Amino acid sequence: LLSFITVFISCTESDNTIDFVLENYEQGAVIRTISSEGDYNYYDTANSIFSATIEEHDTESGGLMQNVEIYVGFNGNESLLQTLQPGEFTTGPTGLPRTNIKVSFADAVSALGLSPSQYTGGDVIGIRLKLNLTDGRSFSSDNVTGSMTGSYFASPYAYNMVIKCIPLSAVPGIYTFNMSDSYGDGWQGSHIKVTVDGTTTYYGIPSPYESDADRNALLEPFSGNDSGGTAKLTIPEGASTMSFEWNSGDYPSECAYTIEYTKLDGTGQQTAFNESSVAAGTKVLSICE
């Protein structure tokens, strides 16, 4: 799409790279992604927002831009969500038009005509940009080369949002903690702390050392040996809040665990959390009912 004069430029000379791009490409246009962030949560469509800062490049430093269309797609179907006009862009630090786009999960599924029963965790909502120029040309993800989607331009024109299932309240079910210790001498004080409606329980691999007797006494029943095993937690119907937290004891680098979830009737088995390099703090589970 863009023609460049052959030149050697250091990867660290970002300003020179920008100057070269602006001065030497002869044709075409791109949308450069400056930054992007956001998640789509099945349980919170209104507050699940994808945002990105984008920058438009053309031979007239933005003068050729007619508009930028934002499409959303799901399972092969696509709908136009929004059209950005040049007036919605401001001049960025490189002298080129920049703007911030936001696409909420709620707006995406509304534009696509989807109900919650038609999508679930692991499904993908696609967001696609189309740059239209005043000379009649258009550029999008279906007509850009690999050199444009990576490197300096970071111009994919498309973003895939995987739907996550992050609970906003307690999810009734059976939680199985599959725990392991690489050294084979228990977790020595490390544990998973779970609080449900203000009641706290602790899960871990008991240590074989007498000095850890008091810490072992805090743990819920465990089935296994010093190298690994399981423990279970049942969260009943009607529970309001739940939180999962990792607290480190001695040698936490030896510890790893997964949390498997099933509904109270044993159906819907799935991995809600997996951590092989443990880190202290609250853990966010993904549970798709």
What residue ranges belong to the model's regions?
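Sec-dependent signal peptide recognition
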Residues: L1-L2
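C-terminal motif of bacterial Sec signal peptides marking the signal peptidase cleavage site
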Residues: T6-S10
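Acidic/polar, low-complexity intrinsically disordered N-terminal segments immediately downstream
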Residues: T12-I174
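Loop and turn regions of beta-sandwich accessory domains that flank beta-strands and are enriched
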Residues: I166-E289
